[in-house]
């Protein structure tokens, strides 16, 4: 099992060293593949030293979204049967979040993913969605059924898609 939290930790050392906290025996190619799945490879390749780029303690020299994607890649290197993502894409834009979700569906379909998110777009393709209201389960179903039956889910969906439909 691997867990990626919203507030994640990077250590002082290279990107490659940080990734290998997930699997100390991971090859460069495995690290690159995990980064591709987490939509991190592209920005890592833009650094002058690529995977040998030094990360400051706490990851202060990368953005919040970059930090989250590196931590997702690190978790993927564990090759977990269960992957828990606790609001772990909150600092990335919705397009990147969608790309990460799509790569999970296509490349790691047999991994059980538990996704905790405030973004409906992050969970809408899940087999089942749990809607919580003040810590109490208010709904449990598919995206389509919750849109028809759950007022809280409907309101959140409407709020999050309103700007997209007007654009």
Predicted regions mapped to residue ranges:
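ABC ATPase nucleotide-binding domain signature
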Residues: 1-9, 23, 58-59, 120
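Conserved D-loop/post-Walker B switch-helix segment of ABC ATPase nucleotide-binding domains
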Residues: 93-103
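ABC-fold ATPase nucleotide-binding domain signature/coupling loops
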Residues: 41-70, 85-88, 92-95, 162-167
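Hydrophobic anchor residue at the start of the ABC signature
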Residues: 72, 116
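A short, proline-enriched helix->beta-strand linker immediately N-terminal to the Walker B motif
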Residues: 77-81, 110
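ABC ATPase nucleotide-binding domain helical subdomain, centered on the C-loop/LSGGQ "ABC signature"
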Residues: 16-57, 101, 110
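C-terminal portion of ABC ATPase nucleotide-binding domains
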Residues: 37, 46, 50, 102, ...
